[in-house]
């Protein structure tokens, strides 16, 4: 089973990962999670690349103690990842991919449907209520909120798993499959040293990124780190320190009452 991770870049609270684990257990086959960062999106720059690669470091820590074979991959030539996706799908039972409504992840999901030699299953991890549940569009935020208030209890009882990796059976390693797929696609793997250097958001990290065809004018933000572990820390701080007054303070920037999650 291949989980091609494009938008829900986390190892917890992720419906797509939950589904991929179910499939791997059902078929007793290795689960390979490929977290890909492509060059082809319009705003590819040093800041976004650094932020995403910091998340890859977090995910590697979370996945390494599980049977998941985790593959962080950074594209070095445009459209390179398409051949890699096709290579991974060749002998796969299924490809699971994030279902995201706009932009690059949506385009990648559509390409996957066209390229893959196996079943492609798109899974929505954008929120508690599936995007397609309303079966209609909303002309105002107010009407959407009313729908949420009326229907959220229908979905909140089945949240994604907070620790899905414990549910994965010992399905074996997919490392040999990964090596073969990269060779067949004639695509270089991404060295862990490169990801680590970039994630440090230092001069060395910017030098490492200089070889990529992206916008180097938009620099990383040194005091803001990406990744799911940082996100969980920020969420915890918001819940413990600001949630009770959020409804009052959020519209007064000088009070510092925002969520800090945007």
Predicted regions and their residues:
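Glycine/tryptophan-enriched, flexible segments
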Residues: 137-262
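Trp/Phe/Arg-rich N-terminal binding region typifying the photolyase-homology
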Residues: 1-172
């Amino acid at each position: 089973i291949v989980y091609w991770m494009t938008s829900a870049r986390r190892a917890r609270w992720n419906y797509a990962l939950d589904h991929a684990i179910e499939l791997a257990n059902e078929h007793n086959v290795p689960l390979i999670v490929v977290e890909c960062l492509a060059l082809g999106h319009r705003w590819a720059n040093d800041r976004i690349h650094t932020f995403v690669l910091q998340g890859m470091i977090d995910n590697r820590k979370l996945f390494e103690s599980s049977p998941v074979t985790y593959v962080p991959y950074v594209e070095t030539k445009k459209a390179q990842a398409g051949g890699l996706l096709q290579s991974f799908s060749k002998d796969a039972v299924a490809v699971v991919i994030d279902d995201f409504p706009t932009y690059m992840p949506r385009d990648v999901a559509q390409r996957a449907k066209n390229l893959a030699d196996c079943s492609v299953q798109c899974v929505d991890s954008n929120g508690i209520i599936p995007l397609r549940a309303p079966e209609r569009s909303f002309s105002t935020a107010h009407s959407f909120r009313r729908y949420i208030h009326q229907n959220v209890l229908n979905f909140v009882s089945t949240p994604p798993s907070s620790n899905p990796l414990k549910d994965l059976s010992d399905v074996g390693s997919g490392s040999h499959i990964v090596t073969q797929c990269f060779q067949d696609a004639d695509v270089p793997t991404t060295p862990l040293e490169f990801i680590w250097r970039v994630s440090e958001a230092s001069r060395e990290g910017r030098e490492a990124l200089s070889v990529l065809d992206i916008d180097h004018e938009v620099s990383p933000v040194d005091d803001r780190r990406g990744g799911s572990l940082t996100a969980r820390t920020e969420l915890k701080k918001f819940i413990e320190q600001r949630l009770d007054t959020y409804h009052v303070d959020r519209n007064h920037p000088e009070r510092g009452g925002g969520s800090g999650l945007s």
